[in-house]
UniProtKB/Swiss-Prot annotation:
This is Indoleamine 2,3-dioxygenase 1. Expressed in mature dendritic cells located in lymphoid organs (including lymph nodes, spleen, tonsils, Peyers's patches, the gut lamina propria, and the thymic medulla), in some epithelial cells of the female genital tract, as well as in endothelial cells of term placenta and in lung parenchyma. Weakly or not expressed in most normal tissues, but mostly inducible in most tissues. Expressed in more than 50% of tumors, either by tumoral, stromal, or endothelial cells (expression in tumor is associated with a worse clinical outcome). Not overexpressed in tumor-draining lymph nodes. Its cofactor is heme b. Pathway: Amino-acid degradation; L-tryptophan degradation via kynurenine pathway; L-kynurenine from L-tryptophan: step 1/2. Keywords: Cytoplasm, Dioxygenase, Heme, Immunity, Iron, Metal-binding, Oxidoreductase, Tryptophan catabolism. Heme b binds at H346. Pfam families: IDO. Catalyzes the first and rate limiting step of the catabolism of the essential amino acid tryptophan along the kynurenine pathway. Involved in the peripheral immune tolerance, contributing to maintain homeostasis by preventing autoimmunity or immunopathology that would result from uncontrolled and overreacting immune responses. Tryptophan shortage inhibits T lymphocytes division and accumulation of tryptophan catabolites induces T-cell apoptosis and differentiation of regulatory T-cells. Acts as a suppressor of anti-tumor immunity. It catalyses: D-tryptophan + O2 = N-formyl-D-kynurenine; L-tryptophan + O2 = N-formyl-L-kynurenine.
């Protein structure tokens, strides 16, 4: 595999990383060829179809469509997003515990075929609902919350626009830091101390800005709506009591399959900076390490390859340690501290949007029928607080200077 940083010290196009939006899909396609109008109609009208109880019947009446008319990457990504949203809506219904355990063949077959082609599991992942689910309202204006919208949501008032777009804007803010990565490796190769120092401080600054963007979640996402509505539609069927064996993809696999729901663990951004800084999140074989390793299977293959390629580059941490240079150590630590701050903030968000609403549920609602059985779990199926605390702790332990 080619190194992420080839001799030109740019990030190779094969990794699908955009200069402006990073791991997000730049300018996603908004419409599929007319051949797929029936899919698009359902996806565009999910809130009405779910509310009226017609969604499942509409899905069951669909004709089986070939994926052969999806000829380019952007149309394939849009079709995956469309089929993923329809699948989540079909499985979880109105979100009150009436669950479907079999995905009809007319949707399961094209969805699985397309997923196989894109090397992603047939479930709605972060790369679908966040990275490919957006548009600019005015193409000539900047990428701000006010000038953006999502392509699809599940229910009216589910805060999906806020949740997906703020997540996307954090990704976009971090894209500025990704651009600096080639400079880091070039500076190490050329032994240019000042260039490396400046690059590390630039990465830290970009990650600090990403944290500021994260604050927007309070303006656009309501904890009750997230907990009781959106969270359910993002839940998967791995380790989920409601689909204890997984989901049957009729006509494609005979046995049910288990897949994790979409989660921030599927974002390549934070894994990318862990790898760059030599923070050993996936070492040690603990639950958190295993989960993060598993989540790579839920990332687009180009991004998985980028992470692998980064891992094969020389270690920034070892280089900084070998120099015995206080300035470099401080710059390295500034990057680590920025990641620690982001992870601490994520813990606060989980407390506000999951733990507190879970504790406020009326007792009669706390049944095993909660679709994501999630009291303290994330949509990816992890015990969320313990997982995030482990990840933050591993990050903190990577600081070169105590305190």
């Amino acid at each position: 595999m080619a190194h992420a940083m080839e001799n030109s010290w740019t990030i190779s196009k094969e990794y699908h990383i955009d200069e402006e939006v990073g791991f997000a899909l730049p300018n996603p396609q908004e419409n599929l060829p007319d051949f797929y109008n029936d899919w698009m109609f359902i996806a565009k009208h999910l809130p009405d179809l779910i509310e009226s109880g017609q969604l499942r019947e509409r899905v069951e009446k669909l004709n089986m469509l070939s994926i052969d008319h999806l000829t380019d990457h952007k149309s394939q990504r849009l079709a995956r997003l469309v089929l993923g949203c329809i699948t989540m809506a079909y499985v979880w219904g109105k979100g009150h515990g009436d669950v479907r355990k079999v995905l009809p063949r007319n949707i399961a077959v094209p969805y699985c075929q397309l997923s196989k082609k894109l090397e992603l599991p047939p479930i709605l992942v972060y790369a679908d609902c966040v990275l490919a689910n957006w548009k600019k309202k005015d193409p000539n204006k900047p990428l701000t919350y006010e000038n953006m919208d999502v392509l699809f949501s599940f229910r009216d008032g589910d805060c999906s626009k806020g949740f997906f777009l703020v997540s996307l804007l954090v990704e976009i803010a971090a894209a500025s830091a990704i651009k600096v990565i080639p400079t880091v490796f070039k500076a190490m190769q050329m032994q240019e101390r000042d260039t490396l120092l400046k690059a590390l401080l630039e990465i830290a600054s970009c990650l600090e800005k990403a944290l500021q963007v994260f604050h927007q979640i309070h303006d656009h996402v309501n904890p009750k709506a997230f907990f009781s509505v959106l969270r359910i539609y993002l839940s998967g069927w791995k380790g989920n009591p409601q689909l204890s064996d997984g989901l049957v993809y009729e006509g494609f696999w005979e046995d049910p399959k288990e897949f994790a729901g979409g989660s921030a663990g599927q974002s390549s951004v934070f894994q990318c900076f862990d790898v760059l800084l030599g923070i050993q999140q996936t070492a040690g074989g603990g639950h958190a390490a295993q989960f993060l390793q598993d989540m790579r299977r839920y990332m687009p293959p180009a991004h998985r390859n980028f992470l692998c390629s980064l891992e094969s580059n020389p270690s920034v941490r070892e280089f900084v340690l070998s120099k015995g240079d206080a300035g470099l150590r401080e710059a390295y630590d500034a990057c680590v501290k920025a990641l620690v701050s982001l992870r601490s903030y994520h813990l606060q968000i989980v407390t506000k949007y999951i733990l507190i609403p879970a504790s406020q549920q009326p007792k009669e609602n706390k049944t095993s029928e909660d679709p994501s059985k999630l009291e303290a779990k994330g949509t990816g199926g992890t015990d969320l607080m313990n997982f995030l605390k482990t990840v933050r702790s591993t990050t903190e332990k990577s600081l070169l200077k105590e305190g």
